[in-house]
Amino acid sequence: MAADTSRPSLRQAQRAVTEQRIIEALAALIDQEHPLEISMAAVAKRAGVSEPTLYRHFPTKRDLFAALAGYQFRTVAAGLAPASADDLAAAVHTVFQRSAGMENVVRWTLAATDPERVPRPNVQARLAMLRTALGDQAGRDDGTTQFLLRTVLLLTSPMAWLYWKDYLGLEPADAAATAGWAIKTLAGAAR
């Protein structure tokens, strides 16, 4: 009889749980100190794993930061599948609220000045989500499509909320309303 491959093996499930603990430990440590000053030993200790276990899952700090960036994206985008510009404008509210709950992680993963240390592994997933939401507007072959995608990419980024928070004191809901208005206005104008 063939083995059931639709479910992860116990080993795969344990690996996923361990990796999640390690990533969550790093996220918690980022709330306490600058990410570049966090040692792998501190992450292992916080996660309750040995250093060899940590290195088996994440051989380098760069690998660990890439996993953190993926975790940040999955956390703020979980369950979102906007199918229109209106859906996208509404989804921004959720993205910004969730980002507020992990502000220091968002700041680090999106604002780090050295992309070699903090890779951006979710760019294609974000662009695909935007293309789906913008539908016909994103399917044109003129320059409008690229301008619209680039602008909406920025408006839907948690960095937009952080910028508005830092410079204008906006809460996530107010920033989302601003971004949502701009998305709907731009998408309407691009038709």
What are these regions (language model features)?
Residues 42, 46, 77-104, 123-126:
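Hydrophobic alpha-helical connector segments
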Residues 58, 68-69, 179:
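DNA major-groove recognition helix of helix-turn-helix
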Residues 28-32, 37-38, 66-94:
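Amphipathic alpha-helical linker/stalk segments
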Residues 68-69, 97-124, 131, 162-163:
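Amphipathic alpha-helical segments used for helix-helix packing
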Residues 90-93, 97, 115-150, 156, ...:
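Amphipathic alpha-helical packing segments from all-alpha helical-bundle domains
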Residues 48-58:
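Short hydrophobic/aromatic patch on the recognition helix
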Residues 1-48, 63:
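Basic, helix-initiating cap at the start of DNA-binding domains
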